[in-house]
């Protein structure tokens, strides 16, 4: 009787349209219930039975029920699932398999089976890539996944590397392919094999892509020739090797090993500027005046060189600082080192006065055993030899940026616009509360940005600098010349690492067109999108492997009284994140560890401070002593506690 009743259908429609709904993201908790977060201010409770229909991170539309002053959300429609492709650990065996996603907030096992054509018999503990196939909000009875790739067995010592690379869908090995002969590019190569070029790298480096030569000129001027490995002499644009390099975009440097952008035969041999081997290069000759200014007579040219020495950072630094046993093998090499140190000094001063110089942070290096175990983690400070190479590379990249801009009007540029204009007023207001007065318009210009950075660098601590970081925009890769505020430069285009960066290979081809006086085609914008995405994935992979290795390294320190100096890097409602000064590990200090009485404690991300009873006790950039309370291997998280 009620079937197909138009009045009833209308009533249903009316009720549906009058029921309040909200769209948001599901946040799971460890207690079974969850929340629908609509925005920063508003969230709704999701009871445990309703949480069975959704997963942490799902974007959904939910019906909002109100009972006795309490609102709760009932998931109704899936907008975007949190999980599509993921990695996890297999449980069970044969025909009754489940997979637990490798994610700190996803604890439930998802029923699964191997995809057709996947020839691996999965067993308990195996790591796999899976794809979600069913979801309760899509009308399915339950969650269900399909195993699409076997990664490795559970006890493999190299799990951190293989699982991380699979998670981010990155290559595990060097690309295939060989380059047998150099291309005929119609370039005249200058013979510089008699000059005393040197390379300065880590002792273990095989892919040397830069060699340096310096000489003194009259009037207190110095000449610097930067010679860069020339992979585009072997790899034709559009060839198979070129396409593979374009997809990879960068060499992926992970703790313990790298996955090169080019075949190892090229990166570590044919193109590598090895000592006493004749190699083709792309070179830049520049003149530096007494105050370190790069004069206008910049010259790019093709050449052949023969590096006369493979020097090592620490040995060169020791020698320049008059320590250690090492010394250059000849007076000619010693003279090169002295001249390069002079160039470094001049360029450093020029950048300090006219651009911006980054504060030196140490690099952290994992020392690994045969089975991937972490033997030690050492902080490697940036010493004089590192700075010699850095200053030479920055100078060479400034030269390329100018030449490409003036001769072609395009290239692959690193662009950083400083502060987001939308944040300028808030930035000025924040600085004012700390006694620094800036003009909201001026700070958006390169000069204004540099002026502010110098004032911040002169502050006694980095606290204020950390407060304004959130107002900064991100660096981008662009085909259009533009300023790099972070470096304090009008334009910056890298070409000094073509073995490990595809963008540098593109700039090589453009510079060669300039040398030959030919026209060139502007690179397509999608290549910059691919490069930015790959850079993001590689950084995430490096961080993920690092987190795993840090957890392994610090596991036996948990619960002991071993003290570590730690810098506070972030404060949130839930506690503080700190970086251990000696090894670079990131640890979390939960709010209850800071003060037992929650009502007396205020952790403010906005102000970067922790207050107890109204007194500021901790702030971002403070260095405090901590002990390791717990290391959770399944989430690779390190929990620390301040030393009372």
From Swiss-Prot:
InterPro entries: CSD, NA-bd_OB-fold, RNase_B_OB_dom, RNase_II, RNase_II/R, RNase_II/R_CS, RNase_II/RNase_R, RNR_Ribonuclease
Keywords on record: Cytoplasm, Exonuclease, Hydrolase, Nuclease, RNA-binding
Keyword field contains Cytoplasm: yes
Catalytic activity of the protein: Exonucleolytic cleavage in the 3'- to 5'-direction to yield nucleoside 5'-phosphates
Listed Gene3D superfamilies: 2.40.50.640, Nucleic acid-binding proteins
Entry similarity comment: Belongs to the RNR ribonuclease family. RNase II subfamily.
Name under which the protein is recorded: Exoribonuclease 2
Organism, scientific name: Shigella flexneri serotype 5b (strain 8401)
GN (gene name): rnb
């Amino acid at each position: 009787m009620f079937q197909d009743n138009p009045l009833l259908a209308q009533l249903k429609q009316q009720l549906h349209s009058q029921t309040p709904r909200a769209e948001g993201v599901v946040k799971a908790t460890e207690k079974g219930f969850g929340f629908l977060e609509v925005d920063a201010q508003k969230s709704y409770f999701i009871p445990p039975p309703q949480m069975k229909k959704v997963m942490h991170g799902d974007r959904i539309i939910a019906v909002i029920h109100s009972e006795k002053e309490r609102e709760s959300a009932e998931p109704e429609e899936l907008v975007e699932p949190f999980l599509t492709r993921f990695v996890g650990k297999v449980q069970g065996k044969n025909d009754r398999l489940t997979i637990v996603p490798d994610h700190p907030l996803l604890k439930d096992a998802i029923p699964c089976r191997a995809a057709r054509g996947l020839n691996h018999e999965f067993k308990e503990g195996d790591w796999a890539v899976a794809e979600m196939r069913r979801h309760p909000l899509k009308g399915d009875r339950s969650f269900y996944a399909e195993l699409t790739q076997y990664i490795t067995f559970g006890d493999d010592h190299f799990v951190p590397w293989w699982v991380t690379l699979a998670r981010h869908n990155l290559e595990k090995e060097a690309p295939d392919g060989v380059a047998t002969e150099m291309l005929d590019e119609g370039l005249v190569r200058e013979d510089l094999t008699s000059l005393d070029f040197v390379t300065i790298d880590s002792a273990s480096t095989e892919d040397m892509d830069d060699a340096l030569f310096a000489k003194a000129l009259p009037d207190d001027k110095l000449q610097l020739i930067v010679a860069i490995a020339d992979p585009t002499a072997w790899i034709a644009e559009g060839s198979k090797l070129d396409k593979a390099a374009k997809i990879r975009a960068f060499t992926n440097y992970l703790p313990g090993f790298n996955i090169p952008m080019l075949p190892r035969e090229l990166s570590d041999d044919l193109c590598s500027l090895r000592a006493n081997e004749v190699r083709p290069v792309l070179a830049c000759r520049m003149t530096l005046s007494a105050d370190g200014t790069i004069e206008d007579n910049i010259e790019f040219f093709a050449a052949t060189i023969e590096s006369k020495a493979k020097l090592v950072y620490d040995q060169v630094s020791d020698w320049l600082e008059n320590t250690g046993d090492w010394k250059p093998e000849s007076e000619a090499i010693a003279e090169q080192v002295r001249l390069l140190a002079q160039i470094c000094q001049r360029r450093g001063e020029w950048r300090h006065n006219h651009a911006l110089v980054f504060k030196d942070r140490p690099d952290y290096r994992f020392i690994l055993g045969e089975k991937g175990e972490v033997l030690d983690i050492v902080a490697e400070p940036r010493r004089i030899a590192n700075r010699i190479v850095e200053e030479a590379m920055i100078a060479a990249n400034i030269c390329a940026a100018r030449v490409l801009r003036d001769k072609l009007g395009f290239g692959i540029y690193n662009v950083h616009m400083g502060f987001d204009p939308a944040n300028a007023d808030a930035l000025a207001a924040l600085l004012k509360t700390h006694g620094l007065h800036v003009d909201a318009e001026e700070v958006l210009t390169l000069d204004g940005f540099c002026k502010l950075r110098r004032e911040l660098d002169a502050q006694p601590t980095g606290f204020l600098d950390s407060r304004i970081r959130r107002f900064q925009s991100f660096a981008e890769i662009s085909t259009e010349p533009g300023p790099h505020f972070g470096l304090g430069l009008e334009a910056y285009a890298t070409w000094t690492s073509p073995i490990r960066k595809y963008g540098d290979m593109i700039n090589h081809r453009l510079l060669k067109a300039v040398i030959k006086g030919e026209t060139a085609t502007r690179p397509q914008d999608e290549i910059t999108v691919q490069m930015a995405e790959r850079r993001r994935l590689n950084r995430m992979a490096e961080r993920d492997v690092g987190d795993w290795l840090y957890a392994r390294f610090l596991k036996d320190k948990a619960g002991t009284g071993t003290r570590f100096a730690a810098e506070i890097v972030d404060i949130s409602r839930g506690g503080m994140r700190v970086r251990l000064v000696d090894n670079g590990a990131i640890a979390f200090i939960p709010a209850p560890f800071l003060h037992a009485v929650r009502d007396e404690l205020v952790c403010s991300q906005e102000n970067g401070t922790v207050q107890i009873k109204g007194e500021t006790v901790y702030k971002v950039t403070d260095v405090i002593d901590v002990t390791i309370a717990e290391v959770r291997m399944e989430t690779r998280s390190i929990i620390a506690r301040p030393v009372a």
